[in-house]
Protein backbone atom coordinates (compact mmCIF):
# COMPACT_ATOMS: atom_id res chain seq x y z
CA UNK A 1 0.00 0.00 0.00
CA UNK A 2 1.25 3.47 -0.88
CA UNK A 3 2.22 5.89 1.86
CA UNK A 4 2.62 9.37 0.36
CA UNK A 5 4.25 12.42 1.91
CA UNK A 6 3.89 16.03 0.80
CA UNK A 7 6.62 18.56 1.50
CA UNK A 8 7.05 22.24 0.67
CA UNK A 9 8.81 25.33 2.00
CA UNK A 10 7.52 28.32 3.90
CA UNK A 11 7.58 30.58 0.84
CA UNK A 12 4.41 28.71 -0.17
CA UNK A 13 2.55 30.71 2.52
CA UNK A 14 0.19 27.80 3.16
CA UNK A 15 -1.84 28.57 6.31
CA UNK A 16 -0.98 26.06 9.01
CA UNK A 17 -4.57 24.86 9.28
CA UNK A 18 -4.53 23.83 5.61
CA UNK A 19 -1.11 22.20 5.96
CA UNK A 20 -2.40 20.18 8.91
CA UNK A 21 -5.64 19.31 7.13
CA UNK A 22 -3.93 17.85 4.07
CA UNK A 23 -0.85 16.42 5.74
CA UNK A 24 1.70 18.79 4.22
CA UNK A 25 5.01 19.42 5.96
CA UNK A 26 6.25 23.01 5.59
CA UNK A 27 9.97 23.67 6.06
CA UNK A 28 10.83 27.18 7.25
CA UNK A 29 13.28 29.50 5.53
CA UNK A 30 15.94 31.27 7.61
CA UNK A 31 15.63 35.07 7.44
CA UNK A 32 18.32 37.42 8.72
CA UNK A 33 17.37 40.89 9.88
CA UNK A 34 19.87 43.32 11.40
CA UNK A 35 22.29 40.49 12.17
CA UNK A 36 19.75 38.22 13.87
CA UNK A 37 18.65 34.99 12.20
CA UNK A 38 15.01 33.96 12.48
CA UNK A 39 13.13 30.92 11.23
CA UNK A 40 9.95 31.63 9.32
CA UNK A 41 6.80 30.05 10.79
CA UNK A 42 8.62 29.53 14.09
CA UNK A 43 10.04 32.80 15.39
CA UNK A 44 7.43 35.34 14.25
CA UNK A 45 3.97 35.79 12.82
CA UNK A 46 3.47 37.60 9.53
CA UNK A 47 2.23 40.74 11.27
CA UNK A 48 5.20 40.71 13.63
CA UNK A 49 7.57 40.43 10.67
CA UNK A 50 6.00 43.41 8.90
CA UNK A 51 6.63 45.53 11.99
CA UNK A 52 10.15 44.15 12.33
CA UNK A 53 10.86 45.33 8.77
CA UNK A 54 9.52 48.80 9.49
CA UNK A 55 11.69 49.09 12.60
CA UNK A 56 14.84 47.57 11.08
CA UNK A 57 17.91 49.51 10.03
CA UNK A 58 18.76 47.11 7.22
CA UNK A 59 16.95 44.90 4.75
CA UNK A 60 16.00 41.28 5.52
CA UNK A 61 17.89 38.59 3.65
CA UNK A 62 16.91 34.98 3.13
CA UNK A 63 19.05 31.87 2.86
CA UNK A 64 18.34 28.62 1.05
CA UNK A 65 17.28 25.41 2.75
CA UNK A 66 20.42 23.26 2.65
CA UNK A 67 21.16 19.89 1.11
CA UNK A 68 21.81 18.47 4.56
CA UNK A 69 18.43 19.64 5.82
CA UNK A 70 16.70 17.99 2.89
CA UNK A 71 18.70 14.79 3.31
CA UNK A 72 17.66 14.58 6.97
CA UNK A 73 14.02 15.12 6.02
CA UNK A 74 14.16 12.53 3.23
CA UNK A 75 15.78 10.00 5.58
CA UNK A 76 13.03 10.52 8.15
CA UNK A 77 10.33 9.82 5.58
CA UNK A 78 12.20 6.77 4.26
CA UNK A 79 12.64 5.42 7.80
CA UNK A 80 8.92 5.90 8.45
CA UNK A 81 8.03 3.67 5.51
CA UNK A 82 6.85 6.21 2.98
CA UNK A 83 6.69 4.95 -0.58
CA UNK A 84 6.50 8.41 -2.18
CA UNK A 85 7.52 11.94 -1.24
CA UNK A 86 6.60 15.00 -3.30
CA UNK A 87 8.47 18.24 -2.65
CA UNK A 88 7.19 21.42 -4.31
CA UNK A 89 9.84 24.13 -4.29
CA UNK A 90 10.10 27.89 -4.39
CA UNK A 91 11.00 29.19 -7.86
CA UNK A 92 14.38 27.68 -8.76
CA UNK A 93 15.39 30.88 -10.51
CA UNK A 94 15.18 32.83 -7.27
CA UNK A 95 16.67 30.38 -4.80
CA UNK A 96 19.18 27.52 -4.73
CA UNK A 97 16.70 25.59 -2.59
CA UNK A 98 15.38 23.59 -5.55
CA UNK A 99 18.87 22.47 -6.58
CA UNK A 100 19.70 21.60 -2.98
CA UNK A 101 16.59 19.42 -2.82
CA UNK A 102 17.65 17.59 -5.99
CA UNK A 103 21.23 17.08 -4.84
CA UNK A 104 20.04 15.84 -1.45
CA UNK A 105 18.72 12.71 -3.15
CA UNK A 106 22.34 11.75 -3.86
CA UNK A 107 23.22 12.30 -0.21
CA UNK A 108 20.31 10.11 0.79
CA UNK A 109 21.71 7.26 -1.30
CA UNK A 110 24.85 7.46 0.83
CA UNK A 111 22.86 7.67 4.06
CA UNK A 112 20.28 5.03 3.14
CA UNK A 113 21.83 2.80 0.43
CA UNK A 114 19.17 1.08 -1.64
CA UNK A 115 16.27 3.15 -0.31
CA UNK A 116 13.11 2.52 -2.30
CA UNK A 117 11.08 5.65 -1.58
CA UNK A 118 10.35 7.62 -4.75
CA UNK A 119 11.12 11.33 -4.40
CA UNK A 120 9.72 13.93 -6.79
CA UNK A 121 11.21 17.44 -6.61
CA UNK A 122 9.11 19.96 -8.53
CA UNK A 123 10.01 23.55 -9.38
CA UNK A 124 6.95 25.75 -8.89
CA UNK A 125 8.41 28.59 -11.01
CA UNK A 126 6.64 31.02 -8.69
CA UNK A 127 6.26 32.26 -5.13
CA UNK A 128 3.77 32.19 -2.26
CA UNK A 129 0.25 30.73 -2.38
CA UNK A 130 0.25 30.51 -6.18
CA UNK A 131 2.00 27.21 -5.56
CA UNK A 132 0.82 26.67 -2.01
CA UNK A 133 -2.86 26.59 -2.96
CA UNK A 134 -2.47 24.16 -5.82
CA UNK A 135 -0.23 21.94 -3.71
CA UNK A 136 -3.02 21.79 -1.14
CA UNK A 137 -5.42 20.81 -3.92
CA UNK A 138 -3.03 18.10 -5.09
CA UNK A 139 -2.63 16.68 -1.59
CA UNK A 140 -6.38 16.87 -0.96
CA UNK A 141 -7.17 14.87 -4.09
CA UNK A 142 -4.55 12.23 -3.29
CA UNK A 143 -5.79 11.95 0.31
CA UNK A 144 -9.28 11.41 -1.10
CA UNK A 145 -8.15 8.51 -3.28
CA UNK A 146 -6.79 10.22 -6.38
CA UNK A 147 -3.89 8.70 -8.29
CA UNK A 148 -0.66 10.47 -7.40
CA UNK A 149 0.67 10.66 -10.97
CA UNK A 150 -2.49 12.27 -12.37
CA UNK A 151 -2.79 14.68 -9.43
CA UNK A 152 0.84 15.78 -9.85
CA UNK A 153 0.29 16.22 -13.61
CA UNK A 154 -2.70 18.45 -12.89
CA UNK A 155 -0.61 20.40 -10.36
CA UNK A 156 2.04 21.08 -13.00
CA UNK A 157 -0.60 22.26 -15.45
CA UNK A 158 -1.96 24.73 -12.91
CA UNK A 159 1.54 26.02 -12.14
CA UNK A 160 2.10 26.47 -15.88
CA UNK A 161 -0.76 28.99 -15.97
CA UNK A 162 -0.47 30.89 -12.70
CA UNK A 163 0.47 34.59 -12.80
CA UNK A 164 0.72 37.35 -10.21
CA UNK A 165 -0.06 41.07 -10.38
CA UNK A 166 1.55 42.87 -7.44
CA UNK A 167 1.47 46.47 -6.24
CA UNK A 168 3.77 48.04 -3.66
CA UNK A 169 2.42 51.06 -1.76
CA UNK A 170 5.88 52.07 -0.60
CA UNK A 171 9.22 51.94 -2.37
CA UNK A 172 11.19 52.00 0.89
CA UNK A 173 11.85 48.27 0.96
CA UNK A 174 12.72 48.14 -2.73
CA UNK A 175 15.16 51.00 -2.15
CA UNK A 176 16.77 49.12 0.75
CA UNK A 177 17.12 45.95 -1.30
CA UNK A 178 18.55 47.81 -4.29
CA UNK A 179 15.63 47.03 -6.62
CA UNK A 180 15.15 50.76 -7.21
CA UNK A 181 17.61 53.60 -6.70
CA UNK A 182 17.43 55.73 -3.58
CA UNK A 183 16.62 58.80 -5.67
CA UNK A 184 13.85 57.05 -7.59
CA UNK A 185 12.35 55.72 -4.36
CA UNK A 186 12.33 59.14 -2.69
CA UNK A 187 10.83 60.88 -5.71
CA UNK A 188 8.36 58.05 -6.27
CA UNK A 189 7.10 58.12 -2.71
CA UNK A 190 6.88 61.93 -2.69
CA UNK A 191 4.79 61.89 -5.87
CA UNK A 192 2.74 58.91 -4.74
CA UNK A 193 3.97 56.73 -7.61
CA UNK A 194 2.89 53.10 -7.22
CA UNK A 195 4.39 50.43 -9.51
CA UNK A 196 2.19 47.67 -10.93
CA UNK A 197 4.38 44.56 -11.18
CA UNK A 198 3.78 41.27 -12.97
CA UNK A 199 5.35 38.00 -11.89
CA UNK A 200 5.19 35.41 -14.64
CA UNK A 201 7.22 32.16 -14.62
CA UNK A 202 9.35 33.54 -11.81
CA UNK A 203 10.27 36.75 -13.68
CA UNK A 204 9.14 40.12 -12.32
CA UNK A 205 8.50 43.16 -14.50
CA UNK A 206 7.12 46.63 -13.87
CA UNK A 207 4.11 46.82 -16.20
CA UNK A 208 3.02 50.33 -15.33
CA UNK A 209 2.89 53.06 -12.71
CA UNK A 210 -0.03 54.94 -11.24
CA UNK A 211 -0.19 58.01 -9.05
CA UNK A 212 -1.94 57.72 -5.71
CA UNK A 213 -3.08 54.78 -3.62
CA UNK A 214 -6.68 55.00 -4.82
CA UNK A 215 -5.65 54.21 -8.41
CA UNK A 216 -3.86 50.98 -7.54
CA UNK A 217 -6.68 48.36 -7.38
CA UNK A 218 -8.30 49.46 -10.66
CA UNK A 219 -4.93 49.40 -12.44
CA UNK A 220 -4.25 45.90 -11.16
CA UNK A 221 -7.61 44.63 -12.33
CA UNK A 222 -7.14 46.29 -15.72
CA UNK A 223 -3.83 44.46 -16.11
CA UNK A 224 -5.40 41.11 -15.23
CA UNK A 225 -8.19 41.75 -17.75
CA UNK A 226 -5.55 42.13 -20.45
CA UNK A 227 -4.09 38.72 -19.60
CA UNK A 228 -7.17 36.48 -19.60
CA UNK A 229 -9.91 35.63 -22.08
CA UNK A 230 -12.80 35.73 -19.62
CA UNK A 231 -12.75 37.22 -16.14
CA UNK A 232 -15.85 35.30 -15.05
CA UNK A 233 -14.19 31.99 -15.93
CA UNK A 234 -10.87 32.82 -14.24
CA UNK A 235 -10.07 31.49 -10.75
CA UNK A 236 -8.16 34.01 -8.66
CA UNK A 237 -6.77 34.73 -5.19
CA UNK A 238 -6.07 37.95 -3.31
CA UNK A 239 -2.92 38.52 -1.24
CA UNK A 240 -2.14 41.25 1.24
CA UNK A 241 0.34 42.18 3.94
CA UNK A 242 -0.63 44.43 6.83
CA UNK A 243 -3.35 46.73 5.53
CA UNK A 244 -6.75 45.09 5.86
CA UNK A 245 -8.60 48.12 4.47
CA UNK A 246 -6.68 47.85 1.18
CA UNK A 247 -7.27 44.11 1.20
CA UNK A 248 -11.01 44.55 1.64
CA UNK A 249 -11.18 47.18 -1.11
CA UNK A 250 -9.30 44.95 -3.55
CA UNK A 251 -11.50 41.95 -2.72
CA UNK A 252 -14.62 44.08 -3.27
CA UNK A 253 -13.44 45.32 -6.67
CA UNK A 254 -12.25 41.86 -7.71
CA UNK A 255 -15.62 40.31 -6.88
CA UNK A 256 -17.25 42.87 -9.15
CA UNK A 257 -14.73 42.45 -11.98
CA UNK A 258 -14.50 38.65 -11.88
CA UNK A 259 -18.13 38.08 -10.96
CA UNK A 260 -17.25 35.63 -8.19
CA UNK A 261 -15.34 35.39 -4.92
CA UNK A 262 -11.62 34.56 -4.70
CA UNK A 263 -10.46 31.02 -4.02
CA UNK A 264 -8.71 32.34 -0.92
CA UNK A 265 -7.54 35.59 0.64
CA UNK A 266 -4.12 35.17 2.24
CA UNK A 267 -1.23 37.02 3.83
CA UNK A 268 2.15 37.21 2.15
CA UNK A 269 4.80 35.62 4.36
CA UNK A 270 8.29 36.67 5.33
CA UNK A 271 10.17 35.42 2.27
CA UNK A 272 8.01 37.34 -0.20
CA UNK A 273 7.48 40.48 1.89
CA UNK A 274 11.24 40.63 2.55
CA UNK A 275 11.45 41.66 -1.11
CA UNK A 276 8.22 43.57 -1.62
CA UNK A 277 8.04 45.29 1.75
CA UNK A 278 5.26 45.30 4.36
CA UNK A 279 2.85 47.38 2.25
CA UNK A 280 1.75 45.36 -0.74
CA UNK A 281 -1.27 43.65 -2.29
CA UNK A 282 -1.55 41.16 -5.12
CA UNK A 283 -3.96 39.33 -7.40
CA UNK A 284 -3.06 35.76 -8.31
CA UNK A 285 -4.89 34.32 -11.31
CA UNK A 286 -4.84 31.52 -13.84
CA UNK A 287 -3.56 32.89 -17.13
CA UNK A 288 -2.81 31.10 -20.37
CA UNK A 289 -0.51 28.05 -20.56
CA UNK A 290 3.14 28.90 -21.12
CA UNK A 291 4.32 25.40 -21.99
CA UNK A 292 1.91 23.51 -24.21
CA UNK A 293 4.05 20.39 -23.90
CA UNK A 294 2.80 20.11 -20.32
CA UNK A 295 -0.64 19.32 -21.75
CA UNK A 296 0.43 16.69 -24.26
CA UNK A 297 -1.00 13.23 -23.49
CA UNK A 298 1.44 10.62 -22.29
CA UNK A 299 1.76 7.84 -24.85
CA UNK A 300 2.22 4.24 -23.75
Predicted regions and their residues:
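Mixed-charge interfacial surface used for oligomerization/domain docking
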Residues: 3-5, 11-25, 30, 93-106, ...
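Glycine/charged-rich beta-loop-alpha catalytic/anionic-binding loops adjacent to active sites
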Residues: 53-55, 83-87, 111-122, 265
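Aromatic side chains
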Residues: 22, 38, 49-50, 70, ...
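N-terminal glycine-rich anion-binding loop in soluble enzyme alpha/beta folds
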Residues: 5-69
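Generic signature of intrinsically disordered, low-complexity segments enriched in small/polar residues
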Residues: 41, 47, 52-53, 73, ...
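Glycine-rich phosphate- or other oxyanion-binding loops that anchor nucleotides, phosphorylated ligands
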Residues: 55-58, 64-106, 148, 152, ...
Amino acid sequence: MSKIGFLTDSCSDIPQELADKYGIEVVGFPINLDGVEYMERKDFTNDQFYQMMRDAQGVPTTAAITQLQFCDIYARYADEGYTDLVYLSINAGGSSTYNNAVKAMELLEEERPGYTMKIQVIDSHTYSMPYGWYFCECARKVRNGGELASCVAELKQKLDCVEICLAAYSLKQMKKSGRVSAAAAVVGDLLGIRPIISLNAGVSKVEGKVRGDAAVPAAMIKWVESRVDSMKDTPYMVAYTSNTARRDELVKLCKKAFGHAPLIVFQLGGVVSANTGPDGIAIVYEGKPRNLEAYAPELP
